Amino acid sequence: MNQPIPTGSRDILPEEMRELRAIESTLAELFESRGYGEVATPTIEFHDVIALADRPKDGSYRFFDEAGSMLALRSDMTVPIARLVANRFASQDGPFRLRYSGSAYRTVRPQRGQMREFRQIGIELSGAAAPGGTVEIVELLVGALDAVGLDRAVVGLGDADLFRQLLADMGVEGAARDRILDCLARHDLVAIEAEAGDLAGIGEEQRAAIVALSSLRGGSEVLERASEIGGAAVERASSRLAETYEGLEAKGMAGRVQLDLGLLRDLGYYTGAILEVYDPALGHVLGGGGRYDDLLGRFGRAMPAAGFALYLERVHIAQAEEERMAREQGARSKEQGASGVGGAA
């Protein structure tokens, strides 16, 4: 009898497992070479710890232990590591450079093809403020993508506070604000336009600003355009993005980064720069991260922090697709070369 497994989970067979381990090993060696030491945290945390992430939609699997305490499977890796840094390095000075790999778990929406269990590999840098700390993690992220053959991948760079401040200055609050932020997190620009059209108490110019900023992306030129559209409301976020982008230009990394002013993630702890990774060979985000300068303070050890995580299975799929495309391009070039030689004869 064929026994099914839950939707959103999967078995991994030996060949794929070897390939996943190879990616993991390559990235682990890179992170270690940059001074990031490996840590591990429990799969199970007290739910109160997970709740400190302040995610609008928690998504964690919760249950009770024998003593009646509410526990949860970790729904990401950043929060447990923030707890670890605050608890285990309480008397030490930073910065702390840590790396990890492990599985996280979230509830899924039926029929969406979402995974309940997903493996992440990433780094967390605690005790390094922006813009220097942000530049460091973006530089390492680009290096990680190159190390696994994803040199066409692009890092989207936005700011978590840009739209929050813009909407606050417009007086957009409560459920209306949350709907727009949710649309941004889902990259649903059509829905943003609809939501902006339904907002009460703001003018057409403000509606147009919401829609225009949500789709504004490119190089440093977009920051000037953002100031023209959003005015003082976006000045702080634009200034931070400009500082980070200048640091990336100095490192020769700006060509791999796209400023995306509509970028927002559904994790409530981000406070400044936010990142997402895209590769043209895959229609899904490969990973993401950003700054979470307030999160460690919730555990009693206030310090600036930033990090990123890559979805291991998605990186593997993108890598395989890039290799397939390279083989096909090589075969076409060979055929064209042979055809040219034959024609000359």
Where are these regions (language model features)?
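Generic N-terminal amphipathic, Lys/Arg-enriched alpha-helix
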Residues: P4-L13, A226
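Positively charged, Gly/Ser-enriched RNA/tRNA-binding surfaces
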Residues: E16-R34, E45-F46, P56, T78-S91, ...
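Polyanion/phosphate-binding surface patch
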Residues: V39-L71
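Residue-level "edge-of-site" marker
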Residues: I44, G158, I180, L261
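Acidic, His- and aromatic-enriched active-site or binding-groove loops in soluble protein domains
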Residues: G59-A67, V172-E193, D279
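Short, conserved phosphate-binding/catalytic loop or strand-edge motifs used
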Residues: E117-I121, L157-Q165
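Short polybasic linear motifs
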Residues: A331-Q336
